[in-house]
UniProtKB/Swiss-Prot annotation:
It is an enzyme of class 3 (hydrolase). Belongs to the RuvC family. The active site is at residues 7, 67, 139. This is Crossover junction endodeoxyribonuclease RuvC. The gene is ruvC. Its cofactor is Mg(2+). Its main location: cytoplasm. It comes from Cupriavidus metallidurans (strain ATCC 43123 / DSM 2839 / NBRC 102507 / CH34) (Ralstonia metallidurans). Its EC number is 3.1.21.10. PROSITE patterns: RUVC. The keyword Hydrolase applies. Mg(2+) 2 binds at residue 67. SUPFAM superfamilies: Ribonuclease H-like. Binds 2 Mg(2+) ion per subunit.
Length: 181
């Protein structure tokens, strides 16, 4: 199975492609799609849409996994990120791909084993898990990480509801839309 992972962003969207053969993961490609901050928002969204569509056509994945939007302190940033994510999802669905969604917590637990891992830890573990010769950019590492999350059975944890029984056993609960322990 070939999986395309996406880390959405308005300035920089990361992508990562990997193959899953049984329990083995193999790196195929990764990179970033950048939009020009000098252009209008609709033009930037079109750049992301076109870039994602091209990546999907080039690497012909069987499915896509994308990171869910987190709620930022700045509502304007959250709205812009949501629009970039929407453009990415449209590009994926436009290529006929099923799209699976994962939170940053799910990604970090799948890759590092710790939900509060920092970007450097995610980069390092992605490099090790996929036997890469160099460290990928943080955007590409997150995209590869979300693909790894999906490859390792993340599709059964696609929603917070899928995680709820395990989290409850660990003393965690949802409060005001956030996970607390």
């Amino acid at each position: 199975m070939r999986i395309l992972g996406i880390d959405p962003g308005l300035r920089t969207t990361g992508f990562g492609v990997l193959e899953k053969h049984g329990n083995k993961l193999a790196y195929v490609a990764s990179g970033t799609i950048r939009s020009n901050g000098e252009t209008s928002l609709p033009e930037r969204l079109k750049t992301l849409y076109d870039g994602i569509s091209e990546v999907a056509r080039t690497y012909a994945p069987d499915c896509a996994a994308i990171e869910k939007v987190f709620v930022n302190v700045n509502p304007q940033s959250t709205l812009l990120l949501g629009q970039a994510r929407g453009a990415a999802i449209c590009g994926l669905v436009g290529q006929g791909l099923p799209v699976f969604e994962y939170t940053a917590l799910q990604l970090k637990v799948a890759v590092v084993g710790y939900g509060r891992a920092n970007k450097e830890q995610v980069q390092e573990m992605v490099m090790r898990l996929l036997s890469l010769s160099g460290r990928p950019s943080s955007d590409a590492a997150d995209a590869l990480g979300v693909a790894i999350c999906h490859a390792n059975g993340g599709d059964t944890l696609g929603t917070l509801a899928g995680l709820a029984p395990e989290l409850a056993r660990k003393g965690m609960r949802v409060r005001r839309g956030r996970l607390v322990g």
